[in-house]
From Swiss-Prot:
The active site is at 224, 226, 231, 404, 406, 411. Residues 219-246, 399-426 form the PLD phosphodiesterase domain. It is a multi-pass membrane protein. The chain crosses the membrane at residues 3-23, 38-58. It comes from the Bacteria. The gene is clsA. GO terms for cellular component: plasma membrane. PANTHER family: CARDIOLIPIN SYNTHASE, PHOSPHOLIPASE D. Its main location: membrane. Keywords: Cell inner membrane, Cell membrane, Lipid biosynthesis, Lipid metabolism, Membrane, Phospholipid biosynthesis, Phospholipid metabolism, Repeat, Transferase, Transmembrane, Transmembrane helix. This is Cardiolipin synthase A.
Length: 486
């Protein structure tokens, strides 16, 4: 009996170390950034069992077998659709401004299509304006409405959107609603899913979360896009979730969330439509490719319209596209670069690009909220401040609530607006969407909004920052080490 227990003990020890060695080898064999690999190895060696479970759950980007098969199966038809779209030569821009050309060239070569012209574009900077405009557009819808959001939380003006959407479905408009399971958990626990389905709306819970799915796909892979499409002509996207900030996270102690959305009319709705169609097919297996733009029924404002490129990221889309786009935009800056983000945990490459821009004379400003709803991100982001300040970057801490807008403005001409935070999760993992706009008129509108943010912010003083307590520095460095995993 003693020999039996001895053998079992030795086998357990051998299996334990074999498991650690196997996971270590897997981490080293994966093509990932060195800081990310080192962070995972440290967790596994300090807390082996917890670290291994965490790595298998969150350490690798896998969509799940069923969704991966759907993503693979949809691309032949999607490629044919893109080929047909290219035949609509009248919607594509033939030239871009000097500052925007490198980014538009990158997008064309990696995504297969150029930016589309002839769009009307309106920047909405308050939730009230956005939701009221959305209700009006829903009431005018005749054919189809598609929506995808990370968070849909009932309450306030959001309920008016829900009622107008159900009314549209009852009068025969084909309505589809795709919501992230984790972000919209309160919605799926409310009466609204049943009410909407009874009204005729297709409601889909994306990337469902439960303990039994932990080892089937990465659980922190989220559907983070915010898109509304109406009649394949009107479109919305930006940073705003389907929430009324007067009722959302009021106990978080960060104030109301501040967002921006872009409302568009024109052929850009078609390019956003193909992104939505891909998401819908990956989640449901149903194919809903949008019709190509029809010049006979869709008015094109070629002389005054905006040129817009759509960048989509996530499993099944071009790898590192968002990251490459941001790097290209930063390196294109010659005079001014302004960035707003709620979560600032950049990659080493992006941090280096921002600092280099400031060091070569570009006026660089970053606007972040003073208070944050994520303690880990709050401390991790501050670990980058010293390097940014030393490079000459101006850091503004917004004091009027949780600044949730995500925007980049380069030389007053090139704008990026969408759902992407400047953190690892948005850059490498989630389903995200970003608009790239080459237009000085829209740039002026965005600059006005950013100036308003700056007016409601406090400029971080480098001397005072260097006098912060030692325990602050230690905490920042601790969370900085785990920043590749945030």
């Amino acid at each position: 009996m003693t020999t039996f227990y001895t053998v079992i003990s030795w086998l357990s020890v051998f299996g334990y170390w074999l498991l650690i060695a196997g996971v270590t080898l897997r981490i080293l064999m994966k093509r990932r950034a060195v800081p990310s690999a080192m962070a995972w190895l440290l967790i596994i060696y300090i807390l082996p069992l917890v670290g291994i479970i965490a790595y298998l759950s969150f350490g690798e980007l896998h969509l799940g077998k069923r969704r991966a098969e759907r993503a693979k199966a949809m691309w032949p038809s999607t490629a044919r659709w893109l080929s047909e779209l290219k035949e609509c030569q009248h919607i594509f821009a033939n030239s871009n401004s000097e500052v925007a050309s490198p980014l538009f060239q990158l997008c064309e070569r990696r995504q297969g299509i150029n930016g589309v012209k002839g769009n009307q574009l309106q920047l909405l900077t308050t939730t009230d304006d956005t939701l009221k405009a959305l209700v009006r557009d829903i009431e005018l819808a005749r054919h189809n409405i598609e929506m995808v959001f990370y968070i849909w939380q009932p309450g306030g003006l959001v309920d008016q959107v829900a009622e107008s959407l159900m009314a549209a479905a009852r009068r025969g408009v084909h309505c589809r609603l795709l919501l992230d399971s984790a972000g919209s958990k309160q919605f799926f626990r409310s009466p609204y899913p049943a009410m909407m389905r009874n009204a005729g709306i297709e409601v889909v819970e994306a990337l469902k979360v439960n303990v039994f799915r932990m080892f089937l796909r990465r659980m922190d892979l989220r559907q983070h896009r915010k898109i509304v499409l109406i009649d394949n002509y009107v479109a919305y996207t930006g940073s705003m979730n389907m929430v009324d900030p007067r009722f959302f996270k009021q106990d978080a102690g960060v104030g109301q969330w501040i967002d921006m959305m872009a409302r568009m009319e024109g052929p850009v709705a078609t390019t956003l439509g193909i992104v939505y169609a891909c998401d819908w097919e990956i989640e449901t297996g149903k194919r809903i490719l949008p019709p190509p733009p029809d010049a006979n029924i869709m008015p094109f404002e070629e002389e005054t319209g905006h040129t817009i490129q759509v960048i989509a990221s996530g499993p099944g889309f071009p790898e590192e596209m968002i990251h490459q786009a941001l790097l290209t935009a930063v390196y294109a800056a010659r005079e001014q670069l302004i960035m707003t983000t709620p979560y600032f945990v950049p990659s080493d490459d992006l941090l280096h690009a921002i600092c280099t821009a400031a060091q070569r004379g570009v006026d660089v400003s970053i606007i972040v909220p003073r208070e944050n709803d994520s303690m880990m991100v709050r401390w991790a982001s501050r670990a980058f401040f010293t390097e940014l300040l030393n490079a000459g970057v101006k850091i503004y801490q917004f004091e009027g609530g949780l600044l949730h807008s995500k925007s980049v403005l380069v030389d007053g001409q090139l704008s990026l607006v969408g759902t992407v935070n400047l953190d690892m999760r948005s850059l490498w993992l989630n389903f995200e969407i970003t608009l790239v706009i080459d237009d000085d008129g829209f740039g002026a509108d965005l600059a006005q909004v950013q100036d308003d943010y700056i007016a409601r912010s406090a400029l971080l003083d480098g001397e005072l920052w260097n006098k912060r307590p030692l325990w602050h520095r230690v905490t920042e460095r601790l969370f900085y080490f785990f920043s590749p995993l945030l």
